[in-house]
Amino acid sequence: MFGYAVRRALRKSKTLRYGVPMLLLIVGGSFGLREFSQIRYDAVKIKIDPELEKKLKMNKVSLESEYEKIKDSTFDDWKNIRGPRPWEDPDLLQGRNPEILKTNKTT
């Protein structure tokens, strides 16, 4: 009889029903996140091969270097062409006649 009363009281208790699972989730989640964040610190400790590091430094690209490459380019003949939507025919949209393209491909 006493066991039944205790089980009934525990079942009705909102703290045990909602509070304890919430606390378990918070505490368990913090331990889980600690493990995932530890991966970041472990990855920083790994040293890169010196030869690979030299290659990475050689291929470094900056905004200024890319600007110097395209600075002298002319864009006078540039034409903005909208890309086709999935239901549209790309040849018709870009002003190309598909029948002319077929004859050019066959000859």
UniProtKB/Swiss-Prot annotation:
Pfam families reported in the protein's UniProt record: COX16 (PF14138)
Annotated region (Disordered), positions in chain: 80-107
Domain of life of the source: Eukaryota
GO CC field: mitochondrial inner membrane
Record topology, Mitochondrial intermembrane segments: 38-107
Ranges in a coiled coil: none
Family affiliation: Belongs to the COX16 family.
Role summary: Required for the assembly of the mitochondrial respiratory chain complex IV (CIV), also known as cytochrome c oxidase. Promotes the insertion of copper into the active site of cytochrome c oxidase subunit II (MT-CO2/COX2). Interacts specifically with newly synthesized MT-CO2/COX and its copper center-forming metallochaperones SCO1, SCO2 and COA6. Probably facilitates MT-CO2/COX2 association with the MITRAC assembly intermediate containing MT-CO1/COX1, thereby participating in merging the MT-CO1/COX1 and MT-CO2/COX2 assembly lines.
Subunit-level organization: Associates with the MITRAC complex. Interacts with MT-CO2/COX; specifically interacts with newly synthesized MT-CO2/COX. Interacts with SCO1, SCO2 and COA6.
Protein name, as recorded: Cytochrome c oxidase assembly protein COX16 homolog, mitochondrial
